[in-house]
């Protein structure tokens, strides 16, 4: 267990930027704005569920 934990910590210390952010290849650089918004899209569906329930009076 300790070995796995230390391996994870070591890898995240060696490659800190690759954990959360990755650069797109140059051919897809024009898609950067879309890729930046993509993680937020599921939240829109979550909010849409509340709007829908409000529209039907939370039946």
Swiss-Prot record:
<protein>
    <recommendedName>
        <fullName>Photosystem II reaction center protein K</fullName>
    </recommendedName>
</protein>
<dbReference type="InterPro" id="IPR037270">
    <property type="entry name" value="PSII_PsbK_sf"/>
</dbReference>
<dbReference type="GO" id="GO:0009539">
    <property type="term" value="C:photosystem II reaction center"/>
</dbReference>
<comment type="function">
    <text>One of the components of the core complex of photosystem II (PSII). PSII is a light-driven water:plastoquinone oxidoreductase that uses light energy to abstract electrons from H(2)O, generating O(2) and a proton gradient subsequently used for ATP formation. It consists of a core antenna complex that captures photons, and an electron transfer chain that converts photonic excitation into a charge separation.</text>
</comment>
<keyword id="KW-0604">Photosystem II</keyword>
<feature type="transmembrane region" description="Helical">
    <location>
        <begin position="38"/>
        <end position="58"/>
    </location>
</feature>
<keyword id="KW-0793">Thylakoid</keyword>
<keyword id="KW-0602">Photosynthesis</keyword>
<dbReference type="InterPro" id="IPR003687">
    <property type="entry name" value="PSII_PsbK"/>
</dbReference>
<dbReference type="Pfam" id="PF02533">
    <property type="entry name" value="PsbK"/>
</dbReference>
<dbReference type="GO" id="GO:0015979">
    <property type="term" value="P:photosynthesis"/>
</dbReference>
<keyword id="KW-1133">Transmembrane helix</keyword>
<keyword id="KW-0812">Transmembrane</keyword>
<dbReference type="GO" id="GO:0009535">
    <property type="term" value="C:chloroplast thylakoid membrane"/>
</dbReference>
<keyword id="KW-0674">Reaction center</keyword>
<comment type="subunit">
    <text>PSII is composed of 1 copy each of membrane proteins PsbA, PsbB, PsbC, PsbD, PsbE, PsbF, PsbH, PsbI, PsbJ, PsbK, PsbL, PsbM, PsbT, PsbX, PsbY, PsbZ, Psb30/Ycf12, at least 3 peripheral proteins of the oxygen-evolving complex and a large number of cofactors. It forms dimeric complexes.</text>
</comment>
<feature type="propeptide">
    <location>
        <begin position="1"/>
        <end position="22"/>
    </location>
</feature>
<keyword id="KW-0150">Chloroplast</keyword>
<keyword id="KW-0934">Plastid</keyword>
<keyword id="KW-0472">Membrane</keyword>
<comment type="similarity">
    <text>Belongs to the PsbK family.</text>
</comment>
């Amino acid at each position: 267990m300790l070995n796995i934990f230390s391996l994870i910590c070591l890898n995240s210390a060696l490659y800190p930027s690759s954990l959360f952010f990755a650069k797109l290849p140059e051919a897809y650089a024009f898609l950067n704005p879309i890729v930046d918004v993509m993680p937020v899209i599921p939240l829109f569906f979550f909010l849409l569920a509340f709007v829908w329930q409000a529209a039907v009076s939370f039946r």
